[in-house]
């Protein structure tokens, strides 16, 4: 009789065969000596379906015989107040002081002279 630990467990493939793509490494010419360098081109609507919409940042991990592409989540949009603060930081010291005084007036901490 077979021991329970030696029974093969069925498993599902990590990637559906329908999601597999076949590519061929081509080349791109490099100016000025026109040397050929290896190139892989990925394009198709399936990229967006897979989470790689136009403009998506991509993390690339390279190993021997394996390249892993990972879509990076979009950065959280900065709030309007933080954008304004970054603009104020670029101003001269005199203008920064004026902004601070204005905020004090709006907050009711200072009186207008």
Swiss-Prot record:
Pfam families: SymE_toxin. InterPro entries: SpoVT-AbrB_dom, Toxin_SymE-like, TypeI_TA_SymE. GO terms for molecular function: DNA binding; RNA binding; RNA endonuclease activity. It comes from Escherichia coli O7:K1 (strain IAI39 / ExPEC). It is an enzyme of class 3 (hydrolase). It is found in: Cytoplasm. Involved in the degradation and recycling of damaged RNA. It is itself a target for degradation by the ATP-dependent protease Lon. One of its GO terms (biological process) is RNA metabolic process. Belongs to the SymE family. Residues 29-74 form the SpoVT-AbrB domain. This is Endoribonuclease SymE. GO terms for cellular component: cytoplasm. Its EC number is 3.1.-.-. Keywords: Cytoplasm, DNA-binding, Endonuclease, Hydrolase, Nuclease, RNA-binding.
């Amino acid at each position: 009789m077979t021991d329970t630990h030696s029974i093969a467990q069925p498993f599902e493939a990590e990637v559906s065969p329908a999601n597999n793509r076949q590519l061929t490494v081509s080349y791109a010419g490099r100016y000025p000596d026109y040397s050929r360098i290896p190139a892989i081109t990925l394009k198709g609507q399936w990229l967006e379906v897979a989470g790689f919409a136009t403009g998506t940042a991509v993390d690339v991990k390279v190993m021997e015989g394996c390249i892993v592409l990972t879509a990076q989540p979009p950065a959280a949009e900065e709030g309007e107040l933080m954008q304004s603060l970054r603009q104020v930081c670029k101003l001269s010291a005199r203008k920064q002081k004026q902004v601070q005084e204005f905020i004090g007036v709006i907050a009711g901490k200072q009186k207008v002279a």
